């Protein structure tokens, strides 16, 4: 089943985010290699197409067997364990995919 995972960054998270990013991306790559990752990405702090530095949070849509597995996976993400995400902002919910773009290019 697909799950929507979202969390907000703490203020001034850039340094912590940069430190935790390689391990965070490795976990996403593992989901991708297993065919379980639909999408993942950060939310820019402000609306600017070239804003790649200042982030306000992240979203992941991935497949897990159940809610508990999705919550456990999210809680073990380096962005959580290294303090990038603000406590109390996590959302992990089941999600039905009713439409998606085929061969989308990001």
Q: Can you describe what each PLM-predicted range is?
A:
Residues 1-106:
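Conserved, structured core segments of small domains
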